[in-house]
Each structure stands twice: as C-alpha cells, then as structure tokens.
Amino acid sequence: MAVINVTSEIGKLKKVLLHRPGKELLNLTPDKLDELLFDDIPFLKMAQKEHDAFADILSKNGVEVVYLEDLAAEAVSQSAEIREKFIKQYINEADIYSEYYQKMIYDFLNAIKDPKELILKTMEGVNANEIPFKNTHSLSHYVLDSGSMVINPMPNLYFTRDPFACIGNGVSLNKMYSVTRCRETIYGEYIFDHHPEYAGKVNRFYNRYDAPSIEGGDILNIGKDVLAIGLSQRTSANAIDSIANNIFDNETSPIKTVLAFQIPAIRAFMHLDTVFTQIDFDKFTIHPGILGPLRVFEITRGTKKGELNVKQIDSTLEKVLEKYTGAGKIELIQCAGGDKIAAEREQWNDGSNTLCISPGTIVVYERNDVTNEILNKKGLKVLEMPCGELSRGRGGPRCMSMPLLREDIR
C-alpha cells in the first residue's frame, strides 16, 4: 500500500498532516511582520483552540490527523548521526556565520534531549538571552541586542500546504519563494529521508535545493492524470517547466497533462488555492477577481527528453475544467456571490480557500458568512471552524492542511 496517495482534491480524506501553532507566534513582533510575511500577530492561546477545533472536525469525520512536529521528531531520533546532521543543517540554514556562535547554538540545541522539544525549539527560534555568549571582540557581538532573535521563528509553519505537496504517490519538496520560508522545508526533507514510514518509499518530483520557487498552495490534483499548478507570485514558470519534466520522466507517474493557471502576481492572490479550490465533482469555489486576467496553458510531454509541448488554451475556465475533470457541466461558485465589497472582504479572509474532505463536504472559515450561505444553498455540507486568530496569517483550511492519503475517485 502506498504511504502517499493523493490523486484528486475531493476524494475521501483518510490522513492529513497539520502543525499546531506554537511558540513561534510569540516571537512575532511588529517590526518583523513584513519580513516574516504576517499582517498581524495572532493570539496564540486562541489560535491553538481554533486549530484544535479544526483537527477535531477532521477526526470526527474519519480523518487520521498527524502532526509535522511529531513526524519530524520521529525522523531525527532514528540515530545520533541524523540528529547531529539535523541540528548542524538547521544552524547553517539560519545563516549563522561565526564558528563561535555556531558552536554555542549547537551546544544549546543538542542539550535538548527530547526530540519533539528539539523540533519545537527549532520552529520557535532562538533568542540571544537563551545562550551565554561571551564577548568575542567582534562587531557582530557588539551589535547583538540583548533579547533579540539570533535565529528567527517560523510562524508560517501552520500552513502545512506550502513546504511540500503530495502528487499521486510522490511529493514535491518545495523551494519556497521567500527567504524567510525556505527553512521550513527542512522538516519535510528529514521526514522523507529518514522517517521509517516514508524513507525510500516516496517519489520526489521536486527538491528544496532546486532554484526556481514553487509552493504547495499552487499545486492542485485535478485528477489521476491531470495536475494543475498556479503560475503566481510564489511559483515561477521555470519551476513549472522543471516539475512537469520530472513528473513526465517518472515511469510510475500516471500524470499526462499539467495545466498552468496564470493568476495576478499579488499578495491577495498569492497562491492558486487562495482564489480557486475544488469542492465537488462538478463544483469549484473561485474569486471573481481572477476571471478576467486568468490564462490557462496545457503542458504535455515533448518528443524529446526534457522537451515540453506548451500551448495556451483558448476557452472558458468552465470548458477547460469540464474537459480535464470529465465531470460534465462545471459550476464556478464565486466568493460572496460576486458582490464586489463582500467578495473582497471575504477573499481577504480566505473565502475561496476550502478543504474538501469528501465530495461535497468542505471545511471553511466561519467568518465568511455570505460565501458559506451560498455554499449551503448549493447543497454542500459546510463544516465551519472558528478562525478569528488563525485567519490573521492569511490562509484558510486548505492552506493549513496537507493531505497524505485520499481515496481515489472514479
């Protein structure tokens, strides 16, 4: 049995990866918001309650919930050598250049014996007050403020969709768009390299060390043989070319077509799933703001290795989806019904970002009243979750989840 199986966006969800927000959110400060890609500072206690409610909804609907921090801890605890390599790599990727600082931080982290506590600490970041640095008579020492972060936190980790994406029986271990998020993929690397459940059992279609950026929020499994990827602020055309070649060259992958959806390269539309998600065989949520500028390209295998056939599809989005899903007539349900003010407001709070846990059953943010009422009237089973704090991170239920196993649809 495959340990990864995701061939659609709507097949019954069997197993999902989450990250419960932790102390990394406590290390968010107003002067770091832009650098760390946040617009506001969530209240951790409430964010955790909301996230627990999310996990509870999934569990009550038959989904096995596993956590990034647990899998990563199990991976690094496989041997002393793996643990040592992880700590050194973590420090190196945090751009700690002084050998003295590297040693002091290594000793500090290595003293944390519990593997889960170690993982959580690396996610939280390291404060200068935690380490007894001596005066090294260097400029870097003199400008190090007491109480400042020596290693920044990773507050975006609760959006588990982005660092890697499951595609069929394989994964794309992503190269993130922003410097501040590139370090997040270290946990996926160690899980797929060293965790006994996954090591050596999962095809890798993209590597975190590749140059062009690609993020999981732009990757949608339209069907067993069709993959959709957003050409967006966070995912480049070069990355789509590269992953398409890797998928087509993999003999075990059934994917024959990659559809590239070009959307405006702005933060409000940062990923394809921010503005477009599948919720049933024949239904998709969509933000009306992308309907005008959206372009779709069909990518298939070329006649030679490394060569692709690319053509722009001159058709409506509905017709494109009807062709590639085989679902018959497609209905696009606009965020807030297309009302300009309500759509912009609810789009800001991820009204189009839904997590489908089985055909027609979706998890949504409760605050998007207009969109949720429309979805209910369309006959969907709408499971609302609290989101007052989680939504401050600008990501919805799909962003906060990485399906590992789904039933295939027929």
UniProtKB/Swiss-Prot annotation:
Pfam families: ADI. The keyword Acetylation does not apply. The active site is at C399. It is an enzyme of class 3 (hydrolase). One of its GO terms (molecular function) is arginine deiminase activity. One of its GO terms (biological process) is arginine catabolic process to ornithine. It is found in: Cytoplasm. Pathway: Amino-acid degradation; L-arginine degradation via ADI pathway; carbamoyl phosphate from L-arginine: step 1/2. Coiled coil: none annotated. Its EC number is 3.5.3.6. GO terms for cellular component: cytoplasm. It catalyses: L-arginine + H2O = L-citrulline + NH4(+). Keywords: Arginine metabolism, Cytoplasm, Hydrolase. InterPro entries: Arg_deiminase (IPR003876). Belongs to the arginine deiminase family. This is Arginine deiminase. The gene is arcA.
